[in-house]
């Protein structure tokens, strides 16, 4: 616990420093800096409070041990031993809690997300599975009390999606859905398969934290905006005016096209939200190669061999290959009952990070 104790003291020192900074009139006048420092202060508060509890109970243990060495009073000895046992139990519990609190936090965990789902290998069946995944996440979001907004979609003639982009807003969305990044494989008999053979198809899911103004500052001069006429599905509702928008962030080359809404203004607003998130995602990676790898990890190539999870319909089975978890309740999972998988992934992630913390 000694190494952990040193880390905790450093956290407490930083917390004190932050409290001084956010009381400084110069910092208060700079709203972006004040927001950033206040957020950091808030993220450390629980750890510091637990650490203060830990120091207090450790002092109680020390005092009780000293008292037991010095007293000859039987009643006092009995009372002190009882208090000491309780204090040691509390100390052990606080040590466990502090270890978890010291696990490096993902700064994006509290953010809303942009989710991109794409039909990949498997043609029409892959696009139908992309639609099934969309419905699965929609139902899960409803259970969580989150709001889902479709910001872009490209539908197929069979009722699936070549791709669909969602904005999901609510409490700690990224912390729960970030593990959905990757290729999702489905094994089932397609509705178009007359012989009843099981086919394997893939859809990919990409999850990006929504960038806040404090995260990324895009100079308007760095954005090129092109407008064009949107094309409705199958010639339906084709807009005769130039309402579709394509935004290019010149320094990074990131392009976002948006034609989901009827008005250019609405498409501009949605395109900017996605562009900000992609640029933020880009700048989180210091090198171009690291960024490319992250985007590849997030969106996936769609190759059938690259998978994080398999959905086997004939056997009503879902397997998450990263943690070796198999659940025989595919019907419930596709209805949005994702808690068991997501909680298992969070525990596995925390366990790995805790092991790294202990080995540092």
UniProtKB/Swiss-Prot annotation:
Q: What GO CC annotations are associated with the protein? A: cytoplasm
Q: Which parts of the sequence carry N5-methylglutamine?
A: 236
Q: Which UniProt keywords apply?
A: Cytoplasm, Methylation, Protein biosynthesis
Does the keyword Cytoplasm feature in the UniProt annotation? yes
Q: Which PROSITE patterns match?
A: RF_PROK_I
Protein's cellular compartments = Cytoplasm
Does the keyword section mention S-adenosyl-L-methionine?
Answer: no
Major subcellular site: cytoplasm
Q: What is this protein called?
A: Peptide chain release factor 1
User: What gene is it encoded by?
Assistant: prfA
């Amino acid at each position: 616990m000694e190494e952990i104790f040193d880390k905790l003291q450093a956290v407490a020192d930083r917390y004190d420093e932050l409290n001084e900074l956010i009381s400084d009139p110069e910092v208060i006048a700079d709203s972006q800096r004040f927001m950033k420092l206040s957020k950091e202060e808030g993220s450390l508060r629980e750890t510091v409070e637990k650490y203060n509890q830990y120091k207090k109970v450790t002092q109680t243990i020390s005092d009780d041990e000293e008292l037991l060495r010095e007293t000859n009073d039987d009643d006092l000895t009995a009372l002190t031993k009882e208090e000491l046992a309780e204090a040691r139990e509390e100390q052990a519990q606080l040590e466990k809690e502090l270890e978890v609190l010291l696990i490096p936090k993902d700064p994006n965990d509290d953010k809303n997300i942009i989710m991109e789902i794409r039909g990949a290998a498997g043609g029409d069946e892959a696009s139908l599975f992309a639609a099934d995944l969309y419905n699965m996440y929609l139902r899960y979001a409803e259970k969580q009390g989150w709001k889902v907004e479709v910001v872009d979609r490209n539908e197929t003639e069979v009722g699936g999606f070549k791709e669909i982009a969602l904005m999901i807003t609510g409490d700690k969305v990224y912390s729960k859905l970030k593990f959905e990044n990757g290729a999702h494989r489905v094994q089932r008999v397609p509705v178009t398969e007359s012989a009843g053979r099981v086919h394997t198809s893939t859809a990919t899911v990409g999850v990006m934290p929504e960038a806040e103004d404090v995260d990324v500052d895009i100079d308007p001069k760095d954005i090129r905006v092109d407008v064009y006429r949107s094309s409705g599905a199958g010639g339906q509702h084709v807009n005769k005016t130039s309402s579709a928008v394509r935004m290019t962030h010149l320094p990074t080359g990131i392009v976002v096209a948006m034609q989901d809404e009827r008005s250019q203004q609405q498409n501009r607003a949605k395109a900017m939200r996605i562009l900000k998130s992609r640029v933020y995602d880009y700048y989180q990676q210091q090198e171009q190669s690291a960024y490319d790898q992250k985007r590849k990890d997030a969106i996936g190539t769609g190759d059938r061999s690259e998978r994080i999870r398999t959905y086997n319909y004939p056997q009503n089975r879902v397997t998450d290959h990263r943690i070796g978890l198999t659940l025989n309740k595919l019907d419930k999972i596709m209805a949005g009952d994702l808690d068991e998988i997501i909680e298992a992934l969070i525990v596995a992630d925390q366990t790995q990070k805790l092991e790294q913390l202990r080995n540092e």
